[in-house]
Design a protein with these regions (language model features):
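Conserved HGGG/HGGXW glycine-rich cap/lid loop of the alpha/beta-hydrolase fold
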Residues: 4-52
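Structural beta-sheet core signal
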Residues: 16, 81, 107, 205-206
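Active-site signature of alpha/beta-hydrolase-fold catalytic machinery across serine-
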Residues: 29, 93-97
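Active-site loop/oxyanion-hole signature of alpha/beta-hydrolase fold enzymes
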Residues: 41-82
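Flexible "cap/lid" loop of the alpha/beta hydrolase fold
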Residues: 96, 102-136
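Helix-loop "lid/cap" segments that line or gate small-molecule binding pockets
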Residues: 139-164, 183-189
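Conserved serine/cysteine hydrolase catalytic core
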Residues: 176-207
Length: 207
């Protein structure tokens, strides 16, 4: 796991958490805007960083490393954390664990889907072959590319922005293994996020 810091370190700290199978670089286009208000720390999960050879094991394992980083560098407290999709689950989990403090948790487009272990294994096993080939090569399946080509320019720009988060159209991500993809999907499904999380001093924003 790596943490990519940028901006003015005297400003409040915000941690940014990518979505499922997404790269830390998916936040690159908004960093300049955020630097007006925050010192940014973009989280790059184990198994999904091009600059190290690791494998994603579980959300709990990743949370422990994130908590250690926040305790070591930021005194155990940060101003904000934003996560989309899987990243939103990480923000929720970090808040409910209460091992560090986040003033504002911002959750975007997180379905908070959960499943039992058997169903999670089946779902993850079904997803891996499709996702692995697409992410590994950086090329959409032909039927998806044809559908994309038929959309209008506004939608196409939106879809391409979404696909770029997975490295699609950027040469692919050959360092990401099938096991990392499986473990990330499986762990997200079986890791329970509490309902009605209420931590004094923390405000949770959901959109």
């Amino acid at each position: 796991m790596k943490f990519y810091e940028s901006g003015d370190s005297s400003k409040p700290v915000i941690f940014l958490f990518p979505g499922t199978c997404c790269l830390y670089s998916s936040f690159d286009h908004i960093l300049d805007g955020l630097h007006s208000y925050f010192y940014t720390v973009t989280v790059s999960y184990d198994g999904f960083d091009p600059n190290e050879k690791t494998e994603f094991y579980s959300m709990e394992d990743e949370c422990e490393k994130i908590e250690q980083e926040i305790k070591k560098k930021y005194g155990g407290r940060i101003k904000a954390a934003y996560g989309c999709s899987l990243g939103g689950s990480f923000v929720s989990l970090l808040i409910q664990r209460k091992r560090i403090h986040i003033d504002h948790g911002i959750i975007g487009s997180s379905d908070m889907d959960e499943a039992g272990r058997l169903v999670a294994k089946i779902k993850s096993s079904m997803v891996v072959p499709f996702m692995y080939k697409m992410i590994h090569t950086g090329v959409l399946p032909k039927f998806m590319q044809k559908k994309l080509n038929k959309t209008d320019e506004v939608k196409k720009e939106l879809y391409n922005g979404f696909l770029n988060m997975f490295g699609i159209g950027k040469g692919g991500c050959p360092w990401i293994t099938k096991q990392s993809i499986y473990n990330q999907f499986y762990s997200d499904l079986v890791t329970k996020v509490q309902h009605g999380i209420d931590v004094p001093g923390t405000t949770i924003h959901v959109f």
